[in-house]
Amino acid sequence: MAAPVLYGGAGGTATGPGDMRRSLMHEKKQVFAELRREAQALRVAKEARGKMSVWDPSTREGARGYREKVVRFGRQIASLLQYFENMHSPALDIIACDKFLLKYQIYGDIDRDPAFGENTMTAEVPVVWDKCEVEVKLYAGPLQKLMSRAKLVGAAREGIPNRNDVAKSTGWNQDQVQKFPDNRMDSLISLLEQMQTGQSKLTRLVKGFLILLEMAERKEVDFHVGNHIHVTYAIAPVCDSYDLPGRCYVFNSKPTSEAHAAVLLAMCREYPPPQFASHVSVPADAEDVCIVSQGRQIQPGSAVTLNPGLVYSSILTYAMDTSCTDLLQEAQIIACSLQENRYFSRIGLPTVVSLYDLMVPAFIAQNSALEGARLSGDLSKAVGRVHQMLGMVAAKDIISATHMQSRTGFDPSHGIRQYLNSNSRLVTQMASKLTGIGLFDATPQMRIFSEMDTADYADMLHLTIFEGLWLVQDASVCTDNGPISFLVNGEKLLSADRAGYDVLVEELTLANIRIEHHKMPTGAFTTRWVAAKRDSALRLTPRSRTAHRVDMVRECDFNPTMNLKAAGPKARLRGSGVKSRRRVSEVPLAHVFRSPPRRESTTTTDDSPRWLTREGPQLTRRVPIIDEPPAYESGRSSSPVTSSISEGTSQHEEEMGLFDAEELPMQQTVIATEARRRLGRGTLERIQEAALEGQVAQGEVTAEKNRRIEAMLSARDPQFTGREQITKMLSDGGLGVREREEWLELVDKTVGVKGLKEVRSIDGIRRHLEEYGEREGFAVVRTLLSGNSKHVRRINQLIRESNPSAFETEASRMRRLRADWDGDAGSAPVNALHFVGNSPGWKRWLENNNIPSDIQVAGKKRMCSYLAEVLSHGNLKLSDATKLGRLVEGTSLDLFPPQLSSEEFSTCSEATLAWRNAPSSLGVRPFAQEDSRWLVMAATCGGGSFGIGKLKSLCKEFSVPKELRDALRVKYGLFGGKDSLE
């Protein structure tokens, strides 16, 4: 053994181990500082921290100077794609997934020389994109100015001096314009004045794009055309419709296309339509929808199957017809945002002003250029989610700033609401400065912040801003004392004022991330987004260990006395009766909870030490058995110097008995302990070879473990994988999220997931459900499936048949009972009255309204049956039955037009005309005197179409006054020549 080497000497140049470690650490610090200075990400973070400015919402300080026009990405969706292509190309694809991760880095020590260590922390924020129900509130928004012809503008200002000019400008028939009554010209002038105010079609286009997004998932849906009013583009019908309130108008440039008419009607009515189940709610444009066209009208009651291509082409056609193509981009972005709504319960959109559609051909077409293209499913999701995140970040920045500055015990919601309602335009402008993505600039008519309430404020405080912070990396200005300011320009201080660091901790806590405070250095820090990642399960393969025989080798010049800690602590004197307790060494957690060995065996050779093999459930190791060394006893104390895991008993058993044992003699020598601490190169190489062999067998162990897990899951829950397969088949079949949940619930209640193991498509699922319904019925089901596809209709039919009392409507009950129906006609559906024309319930209602039910009218028809047929197949209301009964009482003809609406029927007169010729005894008159009411009705009603042949025959028999002759001349060309009856 070599003698110990001593280091000493006053003023000498010799160095010891401490000096070597100090110089090595100095080199490490230099290399670390050099590498950190060259880090590009850190350099960008420092520059961003210095450029960020703040604005105060209460005083508006800092908000000036940001109203100039700036060219920004994202004004159009194509520019949005270019922005992300430059920043992070796969980000849009990643955030379109239901689950994704946003990775951030928190840089510490950025304004001083960094301390050696981990100065940068990484946080991966998980985002599970679930949707929130949103309701659209309408407000009076700005109107788009229109370009009408010069003569129409003059007519609106100065009156109509020349009717021919009006006919030429509008394209109306000159004879009809000339014959239009003078007392009705005021309505035309008022209509032309209203035309000059403009139009507003954004909300209607938004509903169209919402339908398109739903159709992208469902592929094909059946829509019905009906329950609307048709207005022919002519002077009389246009003015008559203008005089009636509560109407909205939509211009149809393709009157022969039923698909185009179905899309236009759906865009005007409330969203969602009956065929959809959506979380978005948009009110209808008006109570009555009027289709204006220059051709024939669409017959009501027809059905048409729509697909995404037909819907998209109809939206573009309507936008070009009404000169509002400049709103397509804005409407598309708003629809995507509503479809992916996650943060807001209400938003504001402008009220639809559609009077322009009543006279579209009279105006000059403009803005006919189409912008943008149809979005794919994933891209529409990404655009909507980016818009939602931008709104969330802007709202939370102001709400959190106000909440943090409010005094404890006081409700800040009143101040937040007052500020957002009165300064929503300024807040929207400043929100667009948070990012280089100008989506907020592209949707100026969408109100978000002014529609928020207290529940929205509370919800924002429970959401982490890290869900949208990744979009504000190039922000130029943010709210003073807001979370963005604290996260970008943050500081961790040693004083009690830790507002910036507390915001970081709170936002990470809201994201379910636990921050390690000891790793965060004090001083300035900033937060930067790194990347977006797909959510995938992180599978950690278990470590398997294999024991191999290894010969221990130590260096010949090894001297354990150089270790100053080997001698151990000095023995301390204790009072009499006080037992000395051994100092407990640190024990790894795995050793404390290790299971006891199941088998022990010893092996020996002549030239190697003895080995003890210990086997447990997951660990097999071999440790050498060292002969017990001579005990070193002291006269004052017998405490051991060190303890080792190589003793004959396990360390777990040794540590558990430390506190109860008496002072024990030293169990091993210092040389043996240090020999095991310092292994030779040969030993290390053998250990490395053993580790590589263990990695080879790692794959087999992992595969066996996965097989056992799958077997266990299959035994415990057979539906583990079947439910996911059924969900995918339903999605491929065109069903939405809510519809898939309804189908899964129906499957659980009936056939079960296990019964659909061999199914490969939605058709197979439907067939299994049909077989189950025909065999056992759906008695346990109390709700119908949503949607209007062929699969849904068939299943709903079986559900209704199994539960007739639960799902039978009053209309179906009327159709089933017919003459035996005895219900209340006042609350019954009008379109089903023809089934119960002779029932006691219908006759009782007629008698209560003083209408004789059994008299013959309109060609030997009973009054009760005739009224039921007209009300069911026409557009009249039940309240019109009394007037209709008086009008047809005593008549021998049935000339009632089926297209006549309730409003048009209300203008009809019930007068009876006198005979034209005196009565004669030579023959019977061909008509009854009450039949003259059809002439009066044809002349006075605002719509409908009467047969000209019958009207001519009636004109020969009755004396028609001049006012009625003029009206019949304009509408039907009667009384036009010398022979007025030809």
Curated annotation (Swiss-Prot):
Subcellular location as annotated: Virion
Keywords of this entry: Capsid protein, T=1 icosahedral capsid protein, Virion
Role summary: Capsid protein self-assembles to form an icosahedral capsid with a T=1 symmetry, about 35-40 nm in diameter.
Ranges where the record places region Disordered: 592-613, 628-655
Oligomeric form and interacting partners: Homomultimer.
Organism (species): Penicillium chrysogenum virus (isolate Caston/2003) (PcV)
Name used for this protein in its record: Capsid protein
Lineage of producing organism: Viruses, Riboviria, Orthornavirae, Duplornaviricota, Chrymotiviricetes
Chief place where the protein resides: virion
Superkingdom of the organism of origin: Viruses
GO cellular component, as recorded: T=1 icosahedral viral capsid
Chain intervals with Polar residues compositional bias: 635-649
InterPro entries in the record: P2_C_fungal_virus, P2_N_fungal_virus
Keyword Transcription appears in the UniProt entry: no
Segments of skewed composition (Basic and acidic residues): 597-613
A Pfam family assignment: Fungal_virus_P2_N
